[in-house]
Swiss-Prot record:
Keyword Repeat: yes
Positions annotated as propeptide: 168-305
UniProt signal peptide: 1-19
Protein's UniProt name: FMRFamide-related peptides type HF-4
Gene Ontology cellular-component terms listed: extracellular region
One Pfam family from the record: FARP
Record GO biological process: neuropeptide signaling pathway
Length: 305
């Protein structure tokens, strides 16, 4: 029942609309709204010659006509708004346009010689890149953004108190140091550097001497026999070479060995019975010490050089 009502209702509404349209056509033969004819002068959507709104005619269209006397959208000679003619006061690019004209006397957007705002001429006080610009000029006496010698703010010269990368005369960056100390440091800077070099060389010589003595003692201990006697009374001196990567602090390598005197831990000789017992109890589960063979190198630290 509901579906039947839904199908009948649109049909009834369409019949009512058709009957009303036929009644209107029978009553008025001249349609003033939907007709696109030429004779009716009171039409609205008609594109004829005398249409007062959307017509593109020659003389009588007051709004959208592009003729000679259109006061709004006409591009003629006397259009006061959107005309690009000689006397347009707003959007005209002529000689006397006071706003958007790019002529000789435009006070705002003109790129002439006497433009006070956006002109790139000689006397522009703001955005001019001339000789006397007080703000954005890159000349000789610019107090703000100039990269000259006497700029007090952003200058990279000799006496800049803020952002200067000078020698050491800046009173702001080196706070807490008086001028006398600064001047003396600057005078004797080379002498201080020489004394520092001498101290570093003396420290290096002491390190070299200590390393040489350590190497001699180690070689003598390795050359001794099992009874504590030195073979033939000779000690083999091994030259010690020191470079910048062999310091005292963090090094890799063999020159930083630590002599371990614990013979039970590192220099023990194992008998056959000890080895057989180890093999019987442990087998291949744990790494066994070398039998009848001493390690070539002793314990070493891993230091960065």
């Amino acid at each position: 029942m509901t579906s039947l009502c839904l199908t009948i209702a649109p049909a009834v509404l369409s019949l009512i609309c058709l009957s009303s349209y036929g009644w209107a056509e029978g009553d008025t033969t001249d349609n003033e709204y939907l007709r696109f004819g030429r004779e009716n002068n009171n039409g609205y959507i008609r594109f004829g010659r005398n249409d007062p709104f959307l017509r593109f005619g020659k003389k009588s269209d007051p709004f959208l006509r592009f003729g000679k006397q259109d006061p709004f959208l006409r591009i003629g000679r006397q259009d006061p708004f959107l005309r690009f003619g000689k006397q347009d006061p707003f959007l005209r690019f002529g000689k006397q346009d006071p706003f958007l004209r790019i002529g000789k006397q435009d006070p705002f957007l003109r790129f002439g010689r006497s433009e006070p705002y956006l002109r790139f001429g000689r006397n522009d006080p703001y955005l001019r890149f001339g000789r006397n610009d007080p703000y954005l000029r890159f000349g000789r006496n610019d107090p703000y953004l100039r990269f000259g010698r006497n700029d007090p703010y952003l200058r990279f010269g000799k006496n800049d108190p803020f952002l200067r990368f000078g020698k050491s005369v800046d009173g702001e960056i080196e706070a807490g140091v008086d001028a006398v100390t600064l001047s003396r440091e600057h005078e004797f800077a080379h002498e201080n550097a020489a004394s520092d070099r001498q101290k570093r060389s003396a420290y290096t010589d002491a390190i070299d001497k200590d390393n040489s003595l350590t190497s001699l003692v180690r070689e003598a201990r390795e050359a001794s026999d099992s009874n504590g006697q030195i073979n033939d009374g000779k000690v083999v001196e091994v030259p010690v070479f020191r470079d910048t990567r062999n310091g005292h602090y963090m090094r890799f390598g063999k020159k930083n060995e630590v002599d371990v005197t614990d013979g039970d831990t590192y220099d023990r000789d194992y008998s056959d019975s000890d080895v057989s017992n180890l093999l019987r109890y442990y087998g291949n589960t744990v790494p066994l010490p070398a039998y009848d063979k001493r390690s070539e190198h002793k314990q070493e630290y891993m230091r960065f050089g």
